[in-house]
Amino acid sequence: WIMGHMVNAIEQVDEFLDLGANAIEFDVDFDDDGVAKYTHHGIPCDCGRLCTKYAVFTEYLDYVRQVTTPGDPKFRKELVLLALDLKLQRIPSEKAYAAGVDVATKLLDHYWMRGWNGGRAYILLNIPLVEDYEFIRAFKDTLRKEGHEQYNAKVGINFTGNEDLDEIREVLEKLGEDEHIWQADGITSCFPRGTERLKKALEKRDTPGYKYISKVYAWTLVRSSIMRRSLRLGVDGVMSNYPDRVVKVLKEKEFSDKFRLATYADNPWEKFTPI
């Protein structure tokens, strides 16, 4: 999975897909009551990027629904995963539940259309800190109450704050979640980062019977050398400001027979087992 990073304006969606991304990450900004208002990162953000691009959250969902609905004139078959970078760290933890209800409801109304020809992409809920775990509970509760639990099959969870992996597992256990789990490791592209925690996450992913990580990705990679380093370690995905650079690296002899771009037929919740 090549994840385009910080794709917050509607016109950027096709821009990043044209560069080779098959997944996009966008920031979801909340008001003080936990209502999702905009796709917006704000200042500061990654080096060399404009931090202020935004869209109204529901309008953004309407657009990506079209892009991921077969038969729609805007359909792009390559876009298979939407990662919502939920800016919950900007609101009080006690509002995390309200935020989960709101995001689930807006996805039902604007993306899935409650079963009426909605978008088909998989959804990854990126949660900054384990203390905001009530968001997940609220999201699942809302799908259940609204009678649309079928969408759980499309939804995964990912804690992105580089917290202790065992602490993350404990929170997932508390929530009763042991599938559809991704693990991100990374830092803003402005700073270097070692591979110690990334290696630990990959080790857990590859431990037979370990359920709490099915995919691991590194973010936000801009240098080809760091992309190569991550691929050598065996990541499932790379988040980048420059998807075209990832595409180029994947074509190199060292990687071209080991990796390929994920398509809609690839299940993002299953561990990859090499043949």
From Swiss-Prot:
Location in the cell reads: Secreted
| Tissues of expression | Expressed by the venom gland.
- Quote the protein name from its UniProt record: Dermonecrotic toxin SpeSicTox-betaIIA2v
Q: Which GO terms describe its molecular function?
A: lyase activity; metal ion binding; phosphoric diester hydrolase activity; toxin activity
Instruction: Give the reactions, separated by semicolons, that this protein catalyses.
Output: an N-(acyl)-sphingosylphosphocholine = an N-(acyl)-sphingosyl-1,3-cyclic phosphate + choline; an N-(acyl)-sphingosylphosphoethanolamine = an N-(acyl)-sphingosyl-1,3-cyclic phosphate + ethanolamine; a 1-acyl-sn-glycero-3-phosphocholine = a 1-acyl-sn-glycero-2,3-cyclic phosphate + choline; a 1-acyl-sn-glycero-3-phosphoethanolamine = a 1-acyl-sn-glycero-2,3-cyclic phosphate + ethanolamine
Listed GO cellular component terms? extracellular region
Q: What is its main location?
A: secreted
UniProt cofactor(s): Mg(2+)
Instruction: Give UniProt keywords alphabetically.
Output: Cytolysis, Dermonecrotic toxin, Disulfide bond, Hemolysis, Lipid degradation, Lipid metabolism, Lyase, Magnesium, Metal-binding, Secreted, Toxin
Single Gene Ontology BP annotation: killing of cells of another organism
